[in-house]
Amino acid sequence: MPAIEVGRICVKVKGREAGSKCVIVDIIDDNFVLVTGPKDITGVKRRRVNILHLEPTDKKIDIQKGASDEEVKKKLEESNLTEYMKEKIKIRMPTL
């Protein structure tokens, strides 16, 4: 089971959207993936993200590579994961 794969639900750990959940829609290369919230569910808009800024979860939805936000939203509703996606995660930064 690869951690970074299309359909994997992840938590963003860096940036302005830190603590928000997103879905991997496409794998661009070894370092970057395309993610979406979708924006109306989690507030994460569709964008390219470094994989070091993501923490994969154990949850995955069955979507095609490059799926639209509407397709992702429909699959989340079918899987009863909409409320799970809306939950924010508190990110704690290590202190020195």
Curated annotation (Swiss-Prot):
Keywords: Ribonucleoprotein, Ribosomal protein. CDD domains: eL14 (cd23702). InterPro entries: Rib_uL2_dom2, Ribosomal_eL14, Ribosomal_eL14_arc, Translation_prot_SH3-like_sf. The keyword Ribosomal protein applies. Belongs to the eukaryotic ribosomal protein eL14 family. GO terms for molecular function: RNA binding; structural constituent of ribosome. The gene is rpl14e. GO terms for biological process: ribosomal large subunit biogenesis; translation. GO terms for cellular component: cytosolic large ribosomal subunit. This is Large ribosomal subunit protein eL14. SUPFAM superfamilies: Translation proteins SH3-like domain.
